[in-house]
């Protein structure tokens, strides 16, 4: 059974299995016959992590873009069936009888019985649950939160959160949680975001850290955290890690490298270059090899743990995306290319991981700005809150000014005096056009099955009528199908000034907080109740409390057009074979003990 989330697993000393998120497959690789010993199986869209149930010889795979799990028979190398999950499943780990699933966009940990797939519980947690690790005694489940840098501590008997540990309000991109049982600590790679900085440049915006958690006291040891740029060199996006005795291996996804740390001295032992976007690690039983999953190359780097060199590279898949889209995706997620970033500090994906938003407000030359999602961006220009980019290729200016890259085009960035008034950048660089192609390929995940509760359905219906009511005026600017109008408008501010701002899309609004250009509204009700009276958002006096509730219910339910949604691998789900003779796990009482043992 897997005790932590991972995209790559050694099943035994000869077989490794890896999730291929960009091929929508998993691969079994025979380490003794890497040429002919690969078996690749279609699963669902964007498989992220996997876990092996040795008792039933089954592999569970999370398909993040289509909200399903695929169950694989390992002996037959075939699909047993699928299970529907909540929205955006990422992590899967097992204890003896249940599977825990993180659902990143519905903020739930789902608990399924391993024998008959019964949904035992749905545990509500804070935003963006992602990685997990299970304590050795299986009493405690630790859950990382990708956007906030928080750790939820879950009692596995009570199936409830007993504590939340914060790495600090600026921590994010928090995925791995690596437990050191002997020292009773855990190591958490993360990126610290200097969002209070009003002069953002490449080397003062984000910082790579490994934070340390005391597992007895369940506290963050702030003074003990390891600054990777100090002990090694500037690296981009430390995302995954693995522990071997007193050595910690940290995969830096954006800078495409591995930082190897001696935990006794807290100094770097070595720095190893690997493939594109390393996002998973596993260690051989002998400890002589480390296997690094390079998700954007479709390869596995094998690292010799004595010489600290890459001894071989194994192909796990041939990524099916077009060459333009794949190249654009690699550039977007890379801080390793000097054209994209100076000294490996920051990538486009540092703030727009997977093309989405980081839920952070940043100071830019035109003011405090909330990071927007880029999914659907090619249909919703102009770009930036100020609407000052008239084409995606104008990100050339951001690459140069913020990321410190030399740029993807020769000569001017074509953003003087402003990007929208200068010559076009489209066609000047195939690489810049490829980034645009990648962003144009992004789609929203499959729509999650919403509640059929009559009261909720009725509230959404009433909200729809209000939204399109000319007296309320929402649809004057937020027009279907993208719920925006591709225009700028002068928007009154609470300080009696006005700003020219581009109309944002309202698609998938419920997961895009904070709201407004400056992130000043933490919730949707704040958008409507804190706006200046008689402004386009200032409807608080003209609508009743129930009408406000209904209007918000509708805006939260707005879905993208079908062509902007991921199409599921399976049109119908096949329920895997159940072992009904084995009863579903019964929930038992357990006295909570915060002492870690």
Predicted regions and their residues:
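Short coil/turn linkers that define WD40 beta-propeller blade boundaries
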Residues: 24, 34-35, 57, 67, ...
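Conserved core beta-strand positions within WD40 beta-propeller blades
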Residues: 15, 58, 98-100, 140, ...
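Periplasmic c-type cytochrome electron-transfer domains
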Residues: 135, 147, 154-156, 172-202, ...
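A short beta-strand motif characteristic of beta-propeller blades
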Residues: 1, 35-41, 78-83, 118-123, ...
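Beta-strand-rich domains and repeat architectures in extracellular enzymes and scaffolds
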Residues: 1-25, 236-239
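Conserved loop/turn at the beginning of each blade in beta-propeller domains
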Residues: 1, 43, 85, 125, ...
């Amino acid at each position: 059974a897997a005790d932590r989330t991972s995209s790559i697993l050694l099943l035994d000393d000869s077989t490794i299995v890896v999730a291929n998120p960009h091929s929508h497959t998993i691969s079994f690789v025979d380490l003794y016959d890497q040429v002919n010993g690969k078996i690749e199986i279609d699963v669902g869209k964007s498989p992220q992590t996997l876990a092996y149930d040795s008792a039933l010889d089954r592999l569970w795979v999370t398909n993040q873009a289509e909200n399903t799990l695929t169950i694989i028979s390992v002996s037959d190398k075939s699909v047993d069936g699928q299970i529907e999950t909540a929205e955006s499943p990422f992590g899967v780990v097992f204890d003896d009888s249940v599977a825990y699933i993180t659902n990143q966009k519905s903020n739930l940990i789902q608990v399924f019985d391993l024998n008959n797939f019964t949904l035992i519980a749905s545990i509500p947690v804070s935003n963006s649950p992602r990685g997990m690790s299970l304590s050795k005694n299986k009493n405690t489940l630790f859950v990382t939160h990708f956007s906030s840098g928080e750790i939820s501590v879950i009692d596995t008997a009570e199936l409830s959160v007993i504590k939340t540990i914060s790495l600090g309000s600026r921590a994010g991109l928090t995925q791995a949680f690596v437990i050191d049982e002997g020292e009773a600590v855990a190591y958490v790679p993360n990126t610290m975001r200097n969002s209070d900085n009003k002069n953002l440049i490449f080397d003062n915006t984000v910082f790579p850290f490994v934070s340390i958690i005391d597992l007895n006291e369940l506290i963050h040891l702030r003074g003990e955290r390891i600054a990777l740029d100090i002990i090694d060199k500037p690296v981009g996006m430390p995302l995954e890690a693995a522990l071997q005795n007193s050595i910690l291996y940290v995969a830096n996804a954006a800078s495409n490298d591995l930082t190897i740390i001696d935990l006794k001295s807290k100094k770097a032992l070595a720095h190893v270059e690997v493939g594109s976007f390393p996002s998973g690690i596993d260690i051989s039983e002998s400890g002589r090899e480390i296997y690094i999953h390079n998700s954007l190359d479709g390869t596995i780097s094998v690292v010799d743990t004595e010489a600290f060199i890459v001894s071989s590279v194994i192909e796990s898949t041939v990524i099916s995306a077009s060459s333009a889209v794949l190249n654009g995706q690699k550039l977007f997620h890379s801080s390793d290319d000097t054209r994209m970033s100076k000294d490996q500090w920051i990538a486009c994906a540092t703030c727009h991981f997977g093309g989405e938003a980081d839920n952070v407000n940043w100071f830019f030359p035109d003011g405090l700005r909330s990071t927007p999602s880029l999914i659907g961006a090619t249909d919703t220009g102009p770009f930036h809150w100020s609407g000052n980019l008239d084409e995606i290729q104008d990100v050339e200016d951001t690459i140069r000014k913020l990321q410190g890259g030399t740029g993807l085009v020769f000569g001017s960035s074509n953003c003087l005096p402003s990007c929208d008034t200068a010559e076009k950048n489209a066609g000047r660089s195939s690489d810049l056009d490829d980034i645009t192609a990648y962003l144009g390929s992004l789609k929203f995940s499959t729509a999650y099955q919403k509640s059929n509760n009559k009261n909720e359905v009725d509230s959404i219906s009433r909200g729809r009528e209000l939204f399109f009511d000319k007296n309320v005026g929402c649809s004057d600017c937020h027009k279907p199908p993208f719920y925006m109008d591709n225009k700028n408008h002068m928007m009154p501010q609470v300080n009696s000034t006005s700003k020219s701002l581009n109309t944002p899309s309202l698609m998938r609004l419920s997961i895009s907080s904070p709201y407004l250009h400056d992130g000043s509204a933490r919730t949707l009700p704040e958008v409507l109740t804190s706006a200046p009276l008689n402004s386009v958002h200032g409807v608080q006096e003209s609508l009743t409390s129930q009408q406000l509730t209904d209007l918000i219910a509708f805006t939260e339910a707005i879905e993208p057009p079908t062509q902007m949604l991921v199409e599921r691998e399976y049109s119908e789900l096949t329920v895997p074979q159940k072992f009904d003779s084995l009863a579903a796990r019964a929930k038992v009482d357990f006295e909570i003990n915060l002492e870690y043992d």
